[in-house]
Amino acid sequence: TRRASDIPGVHNIIVADAPQGQLSLKVQGRSDYKSLQCIVRQHGKMKTLNVQDFNTSVKYLVGKYDIEVLSLPRLNFSVDIKQSHTNTVEIPQPGLANVLLASKGHGDIFLEKDNKLELIHTLNHLSTRETLVMQPGKYRLIFKPQSSRESIYTQERSFKISSGTSTQVRL
C-alpha cells in the first residue's frame, strides 16, 4: 500500500523526531592555524562521522561523540550533545616551533608527559629547517645526522612551547 504522502514525481516530506544540539569549536586568542580541523565520531566507534573546521558550529543528533583535534599533538575530547544546547570545545592558542638543524638527518619530536615520551611528529629527513604549529607543552627533539652510522651521535634538545610565542630549536 502507498501512503498519501508518497506521490511519484512530487517532493515528499517525511517527518521524523530527530533531537539535535550544536558543537562549536574555538581556538583561544589569535591562531597560527591556517585550517585546523577535528574528526567527529560517534562515541566508541572509529568510523568518521564528520570533519569539522574550527571556528564553526555544526548541528548533530543528541548523543555522545568522540572528537580528535588534528593538532600537534593530537587532542581528544568526549562530548555529550544535548537537545537545543551548544557544546563548546575550546583549545589553547598554539605556539610555533622553528626547528633548525645543522645537517639533514632523522629526527622525531616527542611530547614529554608524566615522565614518558610520546611520539607526535617525524621531521622531514631531506630538510634542515621546519616550522611547526604546536599546542603549549614540553617537548623533546631527538635527532641523528644522516652521515652518522652510530647512535653515539644522536642529539637531544628539550624545549617548551607557550601560547602565542615562537621558540627556536637548534641542533
Give, region by region, the residue ranges found by the protein language model:
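Short loop/turn and low-complexity linker motifs enriched in small/turn-promoting residues
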Residues: T1-L171
